[in-house]
């Protein structure tokens, strides 16, 4: 339906949005039917341009700092009005969507976009409900105006673009940005603030279920394997990135997937490969002269993406929900080549490694990254998205693990035999074999060896995995150099963890520097 006065298209279909995007020059059609769009210079998130309005209702509960930058309420009001005025005579696309598959914990949101492909992205990634807002909750508003240019002197922003969350007014403003991932991560941040007050743990994780209804969670930063490992032909997908864990079950916060495409292959990632078809948005993917996507081409960015609805996946959990998880996997991408491919964690170790969030930034998911791969400690495996203090989420995780009896594992999808540039990265089949052993229950009560410096218990055998890979010192030619690197990593853990106020049991669960 279109409004003839200022051309507003309400709840447009996928076909309509693809048509609009092509007619308006926003993108091109690929040979596999997907829509390719380019985001320009900002091909990843812009954390330096993300703000939260500092206002009385939420001020005391937010951990203010470089991640959650404060924005003045009056400045927000002025900027919101300027963006609305800018869009007043533009053709717009509007949908009423929801965030959160749980009937109690959803948030209704009206998404208004200047670009057709941004609206298609929103309809792919958020939930299109059969009946909008059945509990009549107050509705959130997202406005996305990529062609609006912010003026820092006038608007109070840090640059010509911004992302601002306003919890009191239930508004999200995106201006000057074409990278569509900002939309989904904004509403993830909203749920990350709201859910803990309802006793629900919001998680930066993927989730799937087996034929017997057993749920597995995969925590990790972008590029560490959440989407790839949860898209398992033998299991049913709940979701690939954002979930809530409530007493009694797990639910997807989204209605779609946002998969990294760099080096995508049909052999290694058949579920994702098959999901890329008409209706999918490909971000910054390069095509050849026949419009065939070249997933190896990183000339625009390493952070190439595919955004598709869950309906594009044959083996999925149709209600986007699952039982509480028997297995919880923390995915770490270790660039030092020190960590084992799999470790079995106690609940105290789970809390330690959840708070630490040791991993790597893979494939420049943020603009301004100095290199494609660098080690980092990202609290809760998603520090950029969690507005409350880290302890709030860690306490909820401990509570859920203890209550249900979930077993937590640390899985390294990074390097072995040496650091990045010297060693080699664990291949996907090896990691899949480890995950298969985890979800089958094979690793419960198995014989382990203890790595003293890392303070980790490692199984001595895993079906389908070369046993020499399990203890990382075996893969290094220079054993003394491995010991040196392991000590350095333990020291980095200890230094990073010093900022947390936790029990001795949790502090002592980490590596021994």
Curated annotation (Swiss-Prot):
One of its GO terms (cellular component) is cytosol. ATP binds at residues 185, 204, 220-228, 269, 305, 431. One of its GO terms (biological process) is gluconeogenesis. Keywords: ATP-binding, Cytoplasm, Decarboxylase, Gluconeogenesis, Lyase, Manganese, Metal-binding, Nucleotide-binding. Pathway: Carbohydrate biosynthesis; gluconeogenesis. Belongs to the phosphoenolpyruvate carboxykinase (ATP) family. It is found in: Cytoplasm. It comes from Shewanella baltica (strain OS155 / ATCC BAA-1091). It catalyses: oxaloacetate + ATP = phosphoenolpyruvate + ADP + CO2. Binds 1 Mn(2+) ion per subunit. The gene is pckA. This is Phosphoenolpyruvate carboxykinase (ATP). SUPFAM superfamilies: PEP carboxykinase N-terminal domain (SSF68923), PEP carboxykinase-like (SSF53795). The keyword Transcription regulation does not apply.
